[in-house]
Amino acid sequence: MKTIELITIFAMITTLMVTVVAGDPIDPKVLESLVGK
């Protein structure tokens, strides 16, 4: 389970990093879905 959790966290961070680099505004719904999970 810990491995899956690490992959999920890594994916979340990567997504946020790409979003920031792309300069696109972060969708509140996306943040809510990430926090919800």
UniProtKB/Swiss-Prot annotation:
The keyword Cytoplasm does not apply. The modification Valine amide is found at V35. GO terms for biological process: venom-mediated perturbation of blood coagulation. It comes from the Eukaryota. It is found in: Secreted. Keywords: Amidation, Secreted, Signal, Toxin. GO terms for molecular function: toxin activity. Residues 24-25 form a propeptide. The keyword Secreted applies. It comes from Manica rubida. Residues 1-23 form the signal peptide. Expressed by the venom gland. This is U12-myrmicitoxin-Mri1a. GO terms for cellular component: extracellular region. Toxin that induces mild paralysis, and reduces survival and reproduction when injected into aphids (A.pisum). May affect various processes in the aphid, including wound healing and hemolymph coagulation. It does not increase the sensitivity of the aphids to the chemical insecticides imidacloprid, methomyl and Spirotetramat. Has no insecticidal activity when injected into blowfly (L.caesar). Does not display any antibacterial or antifungal activity. Its main location: secreted.
